[in-house]
Regions:
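Primarily recognizes the serine-hydrolase "nucleophile elbow" in alpha/beta-hydrolase
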Residues: 115-188, 206-207, 211
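Short beta-strand element of the alpha/beta-hydrolase
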Residues: 59-68
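Catalytic nucleophile-loop/oxyanion-hole region of alpha/beta-hydrolase
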Residues: 74-76, 81-82, 96-131, 270-275
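Short beta-strand/loop motif that positions the catalytic acidic residue
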Residues: 224-226, 230
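Active-site glycine-rich loops that stabilize anionic/oxyanionic intermediates
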Residues: 67-72, 228
């Protein structure tokens, strides 16, 4: 009976969240065709699936959700359940289906994430949120993608013919969940690195995507969660990024839980790790992304 309890708790939470938010639209990032696409199958076409707050619950912020999966898949429990939780708190959530290895390599993934931020910004009026309150959350390899979006962005391309490309790709905040960060260190995740960069990537490319080396004073603030028991993506990834944020003077909040395996998602059934969503909500209020 005992092993059923976490599953039951997750089911009950999912029912509650679903009553407060529903999936609505699927947005193709490049309606005219994805640059660099190898075909027209679903895996070749990055999209955003929209989860809106219930009527009267919109708090005027948005978040892009990047599931993990080692850059070779997209974990279901880091997908819809995450978006529904954020929507239940008043954020408009957009789940990013980004391109994956080994069919695709860098920069396809960050191109998708940057385009996602721009696209969400272009939808601010339609969905009723502030274009300066757009965050990104990523889990594991999705955390690497989110941290890449937060350190490899641009202000927009003024001469672009596509109006979306004229918008900034900088997220206003990051939520990094047991993230892959330090590609150029012994703490990196070899599977994510291989799917992202191939077997023998140039050293300079690896270093440029070891995102603790890319933090500046202009990097957006971050909320970071990891566990000391994570043997898949070592906690040093979160520690190195937090140290870089501190050195750059960028607001950052780290929650390092003693217990917990890799890939817990919302953490339903884990009495400690399951506290992170509430802590994140408090942080979003303190940072002014949600009303207090």
């Amino acid at each position: 009976m005992t092993p059923r309890l976490p599953r039951l708790a997750f089911l009950l939470a999912s029912i509650f969240i679903t009553e407060n938010a529903t999936a609505q639209d699927v947005i193709t990032l490049w309606p005219g065709g994805t640059p660099g696409a190898k075909g027209t199958e679903p895996a070749d076409v990055p999209t955003l699936t929209v989860y809106k707050p219930a009527d009267g619950k919109n708090k005027g912020a948005a978040i892009v959700v990047c599931p993990g999966g080692g850059y070779g898949g997209l974990a279901a429990h880091e997908n819809q359940p995450i978006a529904e939780w954020y929507a239940s708190k008043g954020l408009t959530a957009f789940v990013l289906k980004y391109r994956l290895g080994p069919r695709y390599r860098h920069p396809a993934m960050i191109n998708d994430a940057n385009r996602a931020i721009r696209t969400v910004r272009s939808k601010a009026g339609e969905y009723g949120f502030d274009p300066k309150k757009i965050g990104i959350i990523g889990f594991s390899a999705g955390g690497h993608l989110a941290s890449t979006a937060g350190t490899h962005y641009d202000a927009g391309k003024p001469d672009a013919t596509d109006p979306i490309e004229k918008l900034s790709s900088r997220p206003d905040f990051m939520v990094l969940m047991y993230p892959v960060i330090a590609m150029a260190t012994p703490y990196g995740h070899s599977g994510s690195k291989r799917n992202l960069l191939g077997d023998n990537p140039p050293e300079e490319l690896v270093k440029s995507l070891s995102n603790e080396t890319q933090v500046t004073k202009d990097t957006p603030p971050a909320f970071i969660v990891h566990t000391f028991e994570d043997v898949v993506v070592p906690p040093e990834n979160a520690l190195l990024f937090t140290m870089a944020m501190s050195k750059a003077g960028v607001p950052c909040e780290l929650h390092m839980f003693e217990k917990g395996r890799h890939g817990l998602g919302l953490g339903m059934g884990d009495p400690a790790f399951s506290e992170w969503p509430g802590l994140c909500e408090i942080w979003l209020k303190q940072r002014g992304f949600l009303p207090k």
